[in-house]
């Protein structure tokens, strides 16, 4: 009888553990496209927290601070692995957690619109599931939330319809350091909890590629003053960058930051805008952009103290090499390598400015080039591309690209034939020997 009681207790405890589920938390009122949401939660950790597991998903991108220190810069992947589901980052042994009181802060950027590389959901928010030993902390109604007051969408020309990202404006006079441990969030609202089945997020699917590689803040190759208000900063190559500026100014001065690729492909892409506060200050653009030069348009009475850039990108090593006596071919190799690398991030891309879209006419070239020039991490992006292509099939089983996408569903037959043929799936298989993926897409 005692053994039966023990068994019943164990089963009940397992049922209880199974029913604990991290839901999606959001702002309790309507969230407009291009909004930035702040979330905070204080947790108490009993023992050593160095070994932990964090599962975190967002629509659309997130930044994570633990005890005031930035731990994840631009987490999350554009939606999604198929038309219904959402990617989830799974992070092992996240740094910064300590025994006792800990403050978790999250900033979420909600695209709120469709694009050639992203399918929008109706729910701006975050799902958090943190396990430390036997303790578990989830996104529930105990979290606090606020709309970040500094972010706004500039009034200028909007990015073309292929991009789900909006231009990003930031007003430093309204800045709140909400990630600080001692920040007072008592005036914030309680989050709204939404069950996954009602969110439009579908199932959470593990992120199949590495987190971004952060190369740190670096000096430009050179900076030239082109006029009283225009500074041109030269990058070492076409790169995915977050431009940075340190300056001294009066409050309310408007600074425009964009690259020479702003109209790459002819249509408007993305740019950043910054409104100064009074005094010495720093600003780093939150959204990445690409180009060979960064153009800073700055009022005359603003004193520029420093200009830098942060390159981030797909986490792979430039492992291949080529050299010969002809400098033309050496230069061609270097340019080709940089062209390949800059078209890799959430997906392979046709271009990193106008579309950021996974057209398979480009992917078949890129996946083949990766075998000669990059390490094995690159092939995870190819595998992701293959699975997405097949998991986004229409109801009649035909395939189309680019995917993921929210405002495109047309088939380009020649690209689709290339994807499933010699230069696509077959090249991937011959280079990796990954039978499981091939079996999955050729059932």
For each predicted feature, which ranges?
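Bacterial Sec-dependent N-terminal signal peptides
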Residues: 1-23
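Extracellular/oxidizing-compartment recognition motifs
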Residues: 23-353, 362, 377-383, 399-407, ...
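Short, hydrophobic/aromatic alpha-helical segments in well-folded domains
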Residues: 244, 290, 369, 385, ...
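Carboxylate/His-rich catalytic cores and anion/metal-binding grooves
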Residues: 254-256, 363-391, 441-443
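Alpha-helix N-cap/helix-initiation motif
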Residues: 325, 355, 410-414, 430, ...
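Aromatic-lined, polymer-binding surfaces characteristic
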Residues: 329, 356-363, 391-403, 409-425
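Structured segments of extracytoplasmic/periplasmic soluble domains
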Residues: 339-342, 388, 392, 428
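Well-ordered alpha-helical scaffold segments within catalytic/enzyme domains
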Residues: 365-376, 420-437
